[in-house]
Regions:
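Glycogenin-like
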Residues: 160-162
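Short, solvent-exposed aromatic-acidic interface loops
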Residues: 146-158
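Active-site-adjacent alpha-helix immediately C-terminal to a catalytic or transition-state-stabilizing loop
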Residues: 88-146
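Compositionally biased amphipathic helical and low-complexity segments enriched in hydrophobic
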Residues: 65, 74, 95, 149-151
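Active-site-proximal alpha-helix that buttresses catalytic centers in soluble enzyme cores
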Residues: 1-85, 119-137, 158
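Residue-level marker of intrinsically disordered, low-complexity segments enriched
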Residues: 67-68, 141-143, 153-154
Length: 162
């Protein structure tokens, strides 16, 4: 079984492609709450995605493992980030994990929601910053997802983006 934690980036700076101070604090706080140790980290090309991963891992008190920038996490694929394209991208990330491995991927809304729909056929409510889905692929290839939601007081909203 492989596991991929796919999250939306934290709160961004309204004037640049980086996290705001609130976003850095949020990513670190969410990272502190994890009990997982990651074998691989994937981020979209956006600076705010890489920063989210860095602050998340800082909160989790983990070193940056093997990592990659994945354009598909920003919707840059042949399908333009369609549900099917995002689902295929998630499967490809799962394939890059070691057997029984755990990965962390940082993407954007609505792309995480599209991936969930492409994998399950079930729509989900829009994600707030640092929320996401936990994707489990069993040895027989069966995929299950679980929503990762934060308490309302933990999130400072910014506008939806890709």
């Amino acid at each position: 079984m492989e596991v991929l934690e796919l999250r939306r980036h934290a709160t961004r700076d309204p004037h640049a492609d980086r996290l705001s101070p609130d976003g850095r604090a949020l990513a670190e706080r969410v990272g502190r709450s994890t009990t997982r140790t990651y074998d691989r980290v994937f981020v979209s090309p956006a600076e705010r995605a890489a920063e989210t991963a860095a602050w998340f891992l800082r909160g989790a008190m983990q070193q940056l493992p093997d990592h990659a920038i994945v354009p598909g996490l920003a919707g840059h694929d042949a399908t333009g980030g369609s549900p099917e394209g995002m689902a295929d991208g998630v499967r490809a990330l799962l394939d890059q994990l070691p057997e029984r491995g755990i990965g962390l991927a940082i993407s954007h809304t609505p792309l995480v929601e599209r991936a969930a729909f492409g994998l399950t056929g079930v729509e989900m409510e829009p994600l707030r910053e640092c929320e996401g889905i936990l994707i489990r692929r069993d040895d027989d290839g069966t995929i299950a997802i679980e929503e990762l939601r934060l308490a309302s007081e933990d999130v400072v909203e910014d506008p939806p983006d890709q």
